[in-house]
């Protein structure tokens, strides 16, 4: 368990439930335009997970990027959303979204997302390659005082 996550916030239990719920879908296949539960695209997966806890996010990663409050990379917490450019839309246009599940003492993190090639998987960040080059920013959707 991350001590960092619980310090100064009441939402630790909610975040843990969110992470546990998301992890139940590891291995679920990717399908463009799908919002679960048998297949997901990236924004469909994030929307599905958050909706289960009463947070209604818009359907696309590019519109989800305009929700919540901006978070600096060094301040990432479990439950935060990370946004990346897509394959074909240029480096500044959001085309992919993931949710932070763990933050390590060195500032690296692990996120869960629906990958086009692997379905729902965990991914370390920074990865020294694909996701590091495409990272755009992060947002916090869940308020510090949100309860489970």
Predicted features along the sequence, with ranges:
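Intrinsically disordered, low-complexity
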Residues: 1-28, 108, 141-148
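Soluble non-cytosolic domains of exported or imported proteins
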Residues: 9-16, 36-41, 70, 129
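Catalytic cysteine-centered active-site loop
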Residues: 24, 28-78, 89
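Glycine-rich phosphate-binding loop
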Residues: 81
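Aromatic- and glycine-rich peptidoglycan recognition patches
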Residues: 94-148
């Amino acid at each position: 368990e991350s001590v960092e996550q619980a310090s100064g916030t009441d939402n630790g239990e909610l975040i843990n439930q969110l992470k546990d719920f998301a992890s139940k879908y590891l291995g679920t296949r990717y399908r463009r335009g799908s919002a679960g539960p048998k297949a997901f695209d990236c924004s469909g997966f994030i929307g599905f997970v958050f909706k289960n806890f009463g947070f209604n996010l818009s359907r696309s990663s590019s519109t989800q990027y305009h929700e919540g409050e901006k978070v600096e990379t060094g301040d990432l917490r479990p439950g935060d959303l990370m946004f990346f450019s897509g394959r074909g839309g240029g480096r500044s246009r959001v085309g992919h979204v993931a949710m932070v599940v763990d933050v390590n003492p060195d500032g690296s993190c692990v996120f869960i997302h629906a990958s086009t090639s692997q379905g729902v998987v965990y991914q370390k960040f920074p990865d020294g390659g694909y996701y590091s080059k495409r990272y755009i920013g992060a947002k916090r959707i869940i308020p510090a005082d949100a309860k489970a």
